[in-house]
Design a protein with these regions (language model features):
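Nucleotide-sugar donor phosphate/pyrophosphate-binding loop at the beta->alpha transition
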Residues: 94-113, 137-147
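Conserved donor-binding/catalytic core segment of Leloir-type glycosyltransferases
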Residues: 165, 169, 180-206, 212
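A short, Lys/Arg-enriched amphipathic alpha-helix followed by its capping loop at the start of a domain
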Residues: 12-24
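Active-site proximal beta-strand in glycosyltransferases
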Residues: 61, 77-97, 111-123
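A short, active-site helix/loop in glycosyltransferases that binds the activated sugar's phosphate group
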Residues: 118-177
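A short, glycine/small-residue-rich beta-strand->loop->alpha-helix junction that serves as a flexible
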Residues: 1-12, 33-39, 206
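Active-site donor-binding segments of glycosyltransferases and PAPS-dependent sulfotransferases
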Residues: 25-76
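Short hydrophobic "strand-cap" motifs at the C-terminus of beta-strands
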Residues: 1, 124, 196-200
Length: 213
């Protein structure tokens, strides 16, 4: 389940299906638009529009952190009978607010509810994992009542599973050209050329200012 199917989320789920062909996959995805509405309404949409598909016999439920997993399993009890894995591509605690963006607590709480009901939680990087834990702790101190201890136990027990990257064919020629340049550089100055890869969107939330520095 991919509730906010942005390019990186789409790539991830498609690669899972391609690299694990021994499994019979059923994929459901919602367009990456109207973020606040999408993160809060996806369970309601799927429960009403995909009820028959979601109540078929499945062995495992794999959902991105944008999925309101707690609500979905409540609306479709059959999904509560199979194990679920929650995968964090990012977390709202590490997402920069920006000058025009007001703080909204709800998009931060929805994934935490999902953590509470998932059998296994995984993050795409150690930074994503640690910043989520730190952010949840900071939020807990500000709330009228502290977040449950069980939540932090599950976050601490979570895994780090990087997204497998498969270079697209059009990059092969470019990489080969870079290797030729590197070889020429080695013969000229005795050191290999440095190759830098930027594997993020070119937007403020990805830290382009830090890269420039």
């Amino acid at each position: 389940l991919s509730a906010y199917d942005a390019a990186s989320h789409k790539y991830w789920r498609q690669q899972l299906q391609q690299q694990l062909p021994e499994f019979d996959w059923t994929q459901l995805a919602l367009p990456a638009r109207h973020f606040n509405w999408r993160i809060r309404s996806n369970a309601m949409q799927w429960a009403s529009q995909e009820y028959e598909r979601l109540t078929q016999s499945h062995d495992l439920l794999l959902a991105t952190s944008m999925v309101d997993l707690a609500t979905l399993r409540g609306l479709i009890p059959d999904l509560a009978q199979i194990p679920s894995v929650l995968y964090f591509h990012e977390n709202q605690f590490a997402y920069p607010a920006g000058q025009q963006r007001k703080e909204n607590v709800e998009p931060r709480l929805v994934p935490l509810y999902s953590v509470m009901c998932a059998e296994q939680v995984a993050f795409n990087s150690a930074f994503n994992r640690s910043s989520c834990i730190e952010g949840a702790l900071a939020l807990s101190r500000r709330l009228p009542e502290a977040l449950p201890t069980r939540l932090f136990e599950k976050l601490e027990a979570s895994l780090v599973l990087p997204v497998p990257l498969v270079p697209p064919p059009e990059l092969s020629a470019i990489h080969h050209q870079h290797e030729n340049i590197a070889s020429a550089g080695e013969s000229a100055i005795g050191t290999a050329a440095l190759e830098v890869v930027w594997n993020h969107r070119w937007e403020y939330d990805k830290g382009i200012g830090l890269l420039a520095e």
